[in-house]
Amino acid sequence: MSLTVDSGQTLQRCLALDIGGTKIASAIVKNGEIQQRKQISTPQDDAAQAMHQTLARLLKEYEGQFDYVAVASTGIINQGILTALNPKNLGGLAQFPLKDSIAQHTDKPIGLLNDVQAAAYAEYQLQNPNDVQNFTFITVSTGVGGGLILNHRLLTEPNGIAGHIGHTLADPNGPICGCGRRGCVEAIASGRAIEAVSSQWDDPCDPKEVFARFRQNDEKATALVTRSAQAIANLIADLKIGLDMQKVVVGGSVGLAEGYLSLVQSLLSELPVVYHCELESAQFGQDAGLIGAAYWVKDCLLQAKNTGVVYG
């Protein structure tokens, strides 16, 4: 991402947008506090044209109330364009020119990043920077995603793809992932992966019921949840040994399910000590993307004041 900023510009008020597959949240973020929060459904029919109209309407509604725009979005933000490892996840929004669409309606600085990267940056604000330089946020939900912070810096990188750790290899003989590769972590650990198995049982159920049965020590449910947790524990071990990760925070509907993180911790503790890593549950809720995007874009803009351009 590249940004330009006037050295005299104030950056107190952010218009933050969080674009998901089913909803778009918007708010003014000032000093880390959410104000004027709104939520609408993500356009599904004639999605691209409807998204242009939705963004125009939101920018009009908040006109005059913000100094910059920060966007957290599902998928990958590549040079301001919305894409994904599995374009089917975006429906009619694949290759949507997100930054240009917003720029048509404001002359304020605009920054964009993946929603899990944004959530990672929000969670990192709660850490002591003297103790934690290398940090990962993992969301285990419908899919598996991540945000990586190394030496205090959030990794987004030129193509916006950094942090897609759900698409690292867990089992070369595992199921085909939505990205087209066989055996990704997401294809084994995610809520979608859990349901792919539990829906085929003689007594089929959804992931919520799987976890209810897991807490009742049901054998099949316990084996399925353990399979998911083992993939996440191995992923964390790889992050620790590969990047000297100091802390991992886990969120998402699966990641925050009762008993899940403690199981991941137990499985991780069975590995040699060099693979151990401090684990915590995510603290931010549904507004992590809004808050994280606002913090990150502001930090990028402040960094730019000396040079006029920053690359995030």
Regions found by a protein language model. Give the residues of each.
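ATP-binding/phosphotransfer module of carbohydrate and carboxylate kinases, centering on a glycine-rich
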Residues: 1-68, 77-81, 102-107, 125-132, ...
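Active-site glycine-centered loops adjacent to acidic/histidine catalytic or metal-binding residues
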Residues: 18, 115, 141
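Residue-level detector of high-confidence beta-strand sites
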Residues: 37-39, 85, 157
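Conserved NAD(P)H cofactor-binding loop of Rossmann-fold oxidoreductase domains
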Residues: 74
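A charged helix-plus-loop insertion that forms the helical arch/lid used to bind
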Residues: 82-95
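General beta-strand structural signal in soluble alpha/beta enzymes
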Residues: 110-114
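Glycine-rich phosphate-binding loop of actin/hexokinase-like ATP-binding domains
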Residues: 130-188
